Amino acid sequence: TRTIPVKKYVRIGHSHFRDASEYFRGLQALCDSGADFVDGVVFGPGDFYLTTGTFVDDAPFLSDYTFEHIYYRSIRERSADYLTTHDFLWRWDTDWFWCSKNFGVQNPLLRRLAGKARLNSRTYTKVMRWNSRLKLTQRLGALFGVRHESVIQDVDIPIERAAEFLDFF
């Protein structure tokens, strides 16, 4: 752990991997490298991304994932990106990682109808609590004979066993 000076912008770089063992070796190397930020996303088998973030004073362009554009999609679309430091820290919140699809607000029309102010984890949490009380999705599922249960689980896996866990999972 180290403290580093904050700058106005963050340069983001995304690297794609197809092999889990190479991906986790790359993750370990980046963590050991002293990068300002390291992030990893597994979209599915053979579709792994490592993201590095580096504080910079200037940005040749800025992306905005606070309303119409969706951050997690940009990972596959761009090898490099720039955000303000504030937007970098909150990059996952607009779409509650990728859970916004469960509310239909990845649809551009519904996204505009919801409005920028409602696209955040606070709103999604309120909707989830409301749904839990009213059991709306359970009732719809029962009506159509569909049962769906959401499970979100964080696990701590030693990096040297991570590829093995991913194969199991």
Pin down the residues of each PLM region:
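Noncatalytic alpha-helical scaffold of FAD-dependent oxidoreductases
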Residues: 1-169
